[in-house]
Regions:
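Extracytoplasmic
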Residues: 47-49, 62, 95, 114-116, ...
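Terminal connector regions
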Residues: 105-144
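Beta-sheet-dominated interaction scaffolds and their linkers
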Residues: 31-55
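Intrinsically disordered, low-complexity Pro/Gly/Ser/Thr-rich segments with frequent PxxP/GP/PP motifs
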Residues: 75-107
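Buried hydrophobic-core signal for structured, non-transmembrane domains
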Residues: 50-56, 100, 117-122
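Bacterial N-terminal signal peptides that target proteins for export
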Residues: 2-18
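N-terminal signal peptide c-region/cleavage motif recognized by signal peptidases
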Residues: 27-29
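Short acidic, flexible loop segments centered on an aromatic residue
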Residues: 58-75
């Protein structure tokens, strides 16, 4: 009888410990290697280009940064704006720039109100030489 009580207490203690570790792991924030210098982009109607500063926060590994524009429904678009360069390598701990350039079709947008687009920046990690490694590409999406 005493062994059964101790086993139940042990199982209860281990279950509580596992639950606490799981909850603690869920609460850990994900840190992006590629950081953007702002939370939104204001593209005034008379501007031709807007420069965004990005930086690789990882001090050991280079990352690729891929940028594109989406409309308000989340569809990837090629006009009236384009991202230059669409893909670039950012060295460890170094800054870089991404430019959003307006195309001639931008002149057809309404000038008396805002039009919503989204700027997306995806970080692509370098290929790992270790077997059985899970790599995650984080993406930042901000209003434009």
């Amino acid at each position: 009888m005493m062994n059964l009580t101790m086993t139940r207490k042990t199982v209860s203690l281990l279950s509580s410990l596992a639950a606490a570790l799981t909850i603690g792991a869920i609460g850990l924030p994900a840190h992006a290697a590629i950081a953007l210098d702002r939370t939104r982009v204001i593209f005034d109607g008379d501007q031709k280009t807007v420069s965004l500063n990005i930086s690789n926060q990882n001090k050991q590994l280079p990352y690729l940064a891929q940028g594109w524009i989406e409309d308000d429904r989340g569809n990837k678009i090629q006009s009236p704006f384009t991202v230059l360069p669409p893909v670039q390598r950012v060295e460890p701990g170094k800054p870089s720039q991404v430019k959003i350039q307006s195309l001639p079709a931008a002149r057809q947008l309404p000038q008396d109100r805002e039009t919503l687009y989204y700027f997306n920046l995806r970080e692509i990690p370098p290929r790992s030489n270790m077997p059985n490694t899970l790599q995650i590409a984080l993406q930042t999406r901000i209003k434009m």
